Amino acid sequence: MVNKQFIAQNRPAEKPAADMSVSLSGLRLDNPVVPASGTFGYGNEFRDFYDINILGSFSFKGTTRDARFGNPTPRIAECTAGMINAVGLQNPGIDAVIAEELPRLKTFFHKPVIANISGFSVEEYAYCCERIDRCLLYTSPSPRDRSVSR
């Protein structure tokens, strides 16, 4: 069980004295701390542990057009160099992410989020990009255009 009182007492009260802001393909982030995609779910999993707004951003887990259960277990194996995983892109699908995850995320995370779109055909990528593009708010289209074109 999470000790919310301990967490609340240990949250940073002030912004850092140094300017840690960075530009990621034209998108300004307060700092360069961005958990890797797939390690942070859709953000909700970590919000009881600390104020995730201290992050510069995060990349939500790989999201496909259709919901995917992922690979059968076991999905993780130890090896000499560490571990290997093959989760298999388990996710609720882009429409569920837009309808459920993003509105929930908006209630507690107030910074840019990086979408990780996955697919098995050009048409699936196009569908996901078109759907997620409707959710994006930019002051100019340049960050999206540069990111997609690379």
Each predicted region: which residue ranges?
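A short alpha->loop->secondary-structure connector
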Residues: 133-137
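Aromatic side chains
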Residues: 40-42, 125, 138
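N-terminal capping/small domains of soluble enzymes
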Residues: 2-112, 119-120
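Conserved small/polar residues in nucleotide/adenosyl-binding loops
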Residues: 138-145
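Distinct, well-ordered alpha-helical segments
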Residues: 125-132
